[in-house]
Every structure is written in structure tokens, then in C-alpha cells.
């Protein structure tokens, strides 16, 4: 995974993470074979032709920038001193800057392109953004969602889903930062240096900026956050496109949360066998009859599933659904490290966003949680930096890290990671059975699980209910595949409680 992320580190340092953290790339061309065809090769060649014609379409959208009069730090000025330096102007970084600065704390946000549009699409449950007062930052809402378990069973969920308007959300956060006198500096951060009560960042242009606290909101590939345990992440990988199509089969009032059907691979035996072991699903947002966002997603795998494999499965699925793409408006590659250990707590650099451990280990969701937890972290920062005691150094680091990750939240995180470890052990049939039982639970539990708002006790109840609602084969999966992750969970909970 380190090899996969390394060429994209610079992009991530400028555009932190999301619900779905995006690496945008133009897919390589594939030349269709010209060998004499057997029946099996015929199907492979037809797939290759479609693969080329669809994935070779260049996205027609162009990078956008915001026309906001942000206050910039003069690169030629002398010593620049702030209370808080935030690395990255993604959703998490700007949300934190907004909330810390409203208390009069001096904040500098460092990003190579702070006025650029975020590249990734974000989907959230509508009630999550309503609870945060951010409902006006949604550009489309669906009153229902659906989950296709297989060709014969579909779950309809009465929980509205929305797509985040990147433009509205970023504009709102930028304007709040401007109003609160946040300063911005256009550069990449190369190094973070520490003294006893002060830290400094060194930028790629040689500029040094000092502050009492450095917060890294630069995304998954950051080198500034330290771990004291092996980073045994699972990985979510997806290929997504916003496309104009001739037509599509989706209901306009329903967002497709997961489509686990594999009938589209009937003529693709080499893909079907792999999908049976490491399944992918379709995530679809239909906006009108000719505009739809489509994403083929591997929920979690270890090691990361081949990106080319994901794209081939998507081509086969769209062909089976009869979806003819006229043009690709936006394209995105999503790679999200999930689960694994939390960063070392405490340490000299604080984190928020993808590198802070707040990604949902079983789903990859994060943007709503970032919006919710940034004010929590801001409060811990303000209590330290804004206090009459002038808390700095190790005491400040301890306060802010434990503000984001108190004991109960760390224990809850271990429980969610247990869910991820269970998913890693399931094939397509096991995954279908699990979600069939999961979405039959009381909405309090499945909704709470997906939104990261259940307590340890509630998660235990959910597990018992899931066992009770599951089929005999689901129970067999739980009994045979969960003991090792369960023992690890109990051990980690014991360590956290010490």
C-alpha cells in the first residue's frame, strides 16, 4: 500500500480526506487482443473493447477555484507566529480552522491550493448533516436507499441519503474562516520541527512558520503522524465516475447504497471467480434519467484489491445493465486505509481527518464524522491555548489527543475494527448473508452503527441481535470466523483500559 500511495503523497497533502478519499488518475489504455478467438476469448475481447471505449473517455470537467478573498501570510515577512497551524485545507482542516478561530485563537492554514475545489464526491445520511446544521450543503437528496443482496432480494431503507455539495460546503467553511481572521499560506509542508513549548513547519519554499500546536489534516499519506503499532489496515478501493448516459435502470427516488449482485459476471468467468472470493458492489446516485454517479467498490480487503480488477468489474456491470456512457464528467479513484491501530497518543503533532483514525473501519465513511468531531477537538484546543494557565508542550498534546480520543471512544473504535476484521474473512456469499441480517435489525442499531454513534454496550447488543437474526449459515460464519478477531478485540479493550 505504501508503494501505491507514494506517488500521490503530494496530492494528499493538499487535499485531505473525506468520506471517500480520492486519488484522481486517468486510467491507462488497454489494447484489445487480436488473437484467434475461442468462445471464452470472445467474451474477454468484447469486455476489452467496452473497457477501452468506456474508460478511455477523458473527464470533461475542469479544475475549479473559489473566488474568496482569503488573507494570506506574506512569504517575505519575517517571523510568522500563530497559536495553531493546520496542515491541509480539506473538509476536516477547514472545519477545525473555522471552530478554533471563532474563539479568537490565531490560526494559519497551510495548503498548496487552498481555493481549489475538492476532487472527491461525498455521500452522507441526511440526518447526519441535519444534526450538524449543514443540510443546506447538500445538493441532492434521495428519500430512500436500497441494498441489492442478490438477484432475488432487495432491502429498502427508509433513511434519506444525500450528496454533499463540495462547492457549498467549502464556500461556507472558507467564508467562516475569513470572518474569523484565519490566515492562509500557499505551500506544501516539508518538515515539522519541535521545541519544548513550540513547533515549526518548514515549507517547500523555505518559509518557516511557528505555532504552539501543529495539526495535520493532510490525509492518509502524511508522514507527520507516528504510530507505535504495525499499521495493519484494511483497504477500501473504488473507481467512481459522474457520467452522462443514454439511460439507466435506477429509480430516481432511491440511492443504491450497495448492489451485491453478480449476474453481470455470467460471461466473465475469470472475473466471477475472483469476485466470489473478494466481492465488489455498485454504489449509485441517480440524479436524472441521463446523469448518474456510479462507483464500483471493494468494501474492505487486505491487501488492497487490484484497481484494474475493480474497473473491469465495473465495465462488465454497466454492460449488463445496458448503461451506455455518452461522456465522463468526473472520474475518481478512491483508496481508503481502514481500521488498524490509532496513532500514538499523545504525540507532538495533532491529527484530524484521514490520518487520525476516525474513518469508519467497516464502511469507509468519514466526512460527517470529521464535521462532527472537529468542533470537539477545537474545544479541547481552546481549553488549552485559551486558558489563563497557558498550557503548552506535552500537557497540551495530552489534552488535545485525549479530547479527540477519550477512553470510551477508543474502546468503541476497537469494536468497529472488529467488524472490519469480520468482513475481511467473508466471501461474497457470507457478505450477502451478513448484510441480509444486518439490515433486518432495529433501525436504531444499523443506523447507529453506520453513523458511528453506538456505545460499547449497544454494539454488544447489536452483535447478539445479528446472531439471532442471521441464518444458520450466518451463525456458522460468526462462530468459525470471528474467534480470532474477538480474542484480539478483548485483548485490545483490556490494554486500552489499563
Curated annotation (Swiss-Prot):
Pfam families: Lycopene_cycl. Belongs to the lycopene cyclase family. Its main location: plastid. This is Neoxanthin synthase, chloroplastic. Involved in the synthesis of neoxanthin, the last product of carotenoid synthesis and a precursor of abscisic acid. PANTHER family: CAPSANTHIN_CAPSORUBIN SYNTHASE, CHROMOPLAST PROTEIN, PTHR39757. Pathway: Carotenoid biosynthesis; neoxanthin biosynthesis.
Amino acid at each position: 500500500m505504501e508503494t501505491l500511495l507514494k506517488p500521490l503523497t503530494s496530492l494528499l497533502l493538499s487535499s485531505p480526506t473525506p468520506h471517500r478519499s480520492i486519488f484522481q488518475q486517468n486510467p491507462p489504455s488497454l489494447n484489445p487482443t487480436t488473437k484467434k478467438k475461442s468462445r471464452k476469448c470472445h467474451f474477454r475481447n468484447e469486455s476489452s473493447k467496452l473497457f477501452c471505449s468506456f474508460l478511455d473517455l477523458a473527464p470533461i470537467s475542469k479544475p475549479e477555484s473559489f473566488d474568496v478573498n482569503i488573507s494570506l501570510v506574506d512569504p517575505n515577512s519575517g517571523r510568522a507566529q500563530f497559536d495553531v497551524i493546520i496542515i491541509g485545507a480539506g473538509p476536516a482542516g477547514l472545519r477545525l480552522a473555522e471552530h478554533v478561530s471563532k474563539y479568537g485563537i490565531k490560526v494559519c492554514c497551510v495548503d498548496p491550493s487552498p481555493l481549489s475545489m475538492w476532487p472527491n464526491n461525498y455521500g452522507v445520511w441526511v440526518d447526519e448533516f441535519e444534526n450538524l446544521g449543514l443540510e443546506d450543503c447538500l445538493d441532492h437528496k434521495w428519500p430512500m436507499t436500497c441494498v441489492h443482496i442478490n438477484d432475488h432480494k432487495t432491502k429498502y431503507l427508509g433513511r434519506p441519503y444525500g450528496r454533499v455539495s463540495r462547492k457549498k460546503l467549502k464556500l461556507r467553511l472558507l467564508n467562516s474562516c475569513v470572518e474569523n481572521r484565519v490566515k492562509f499560506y500557499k505551500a506544501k509542508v516539508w518538515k515539522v520541527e519541535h521545541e519544548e513549548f513550540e513547533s515549526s513547519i518548514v515549507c517547500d519554499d523555505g518559509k518557516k512558520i511557528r505555532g504552539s500546536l501543529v495539526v495535520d489534516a493532510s490525509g492518509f499519506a502524511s508522514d507527520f503522524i507516528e504510530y507505535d503499532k504495525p499499521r495493519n489496515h484494511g483497504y477500501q478501493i473504488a473507481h467512481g465516475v459522474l457520467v452522462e448516459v443514454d439511460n439507466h435502470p435506477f429509480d430516481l427516488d432511491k440511492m443504491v447504497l450497495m448492489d451485491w449482485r453478480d449476474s453481470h459476471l455470467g460471461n466473465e468467468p475469470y472475473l466471477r471467480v475472483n469476485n466470489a472470493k473478494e466481492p465488489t458492489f455498485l454504489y449509485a446516485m441517480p440524479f436524472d434519467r441521463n446523469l448518474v454517479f456510479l462507483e464500483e467498490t471493494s468494501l474492505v480487503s487486505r491487501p488492497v484489491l487490484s484497481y484494474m480488477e475493480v474497473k473491469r468489474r465495473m465495465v462488465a456491470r454497466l454492460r449488463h445493465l445496458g448503461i451506455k456512457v455518452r461522456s465522463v464528467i468526473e472520474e475518481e479513484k478512491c483508496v481508503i486505509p481502514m481500521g488498524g491501530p490509532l496513532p500514538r497518543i499523545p504525540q507532538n503533532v495533532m491529527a484530524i481527518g484521514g490520518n487520525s483514525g476516525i474513518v469508519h473501519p467497516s464502511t469507509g465513511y468519514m466526512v460527517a464524522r470529521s464535521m462532527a468531531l472537529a468542533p470537539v477537538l477545537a474545544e479541547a484546543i481552546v481549553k488549552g491555548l485559551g486558558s489563563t494557565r497557558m498550557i503548552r508542550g506535552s500537557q497540551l498534546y495530552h489534552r488535545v489527543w485525549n479530547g479527540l480520543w477519550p477512553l470510551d471512544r477508543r474502546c468503541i473504535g476497537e469494536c468497529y475494527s472488529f467488524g472490519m476484521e469480520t468482513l475481511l474473512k467473508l466471501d461474497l456469499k457470507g457478505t450477502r448473508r451478513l448484510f441480509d441480517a444486518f439490515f433486518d435489525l432495529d433501525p436504531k442499531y444499523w443506523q447507529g452503527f453506520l453513523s458511528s454513534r453506538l456505545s460499547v454496550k449497544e454494539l454488544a447488543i447489536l452483535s447478539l441481535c445479528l446472531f439471532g437474526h442471521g441464518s444458520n449459515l450466518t451463525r456458522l460464519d460468526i462462530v468459525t470466523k470471528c474467534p480470532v478477531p474477538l480474542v484480539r478485540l478483548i485483548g485490545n479493550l483490556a490494554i486500552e483500559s489499563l
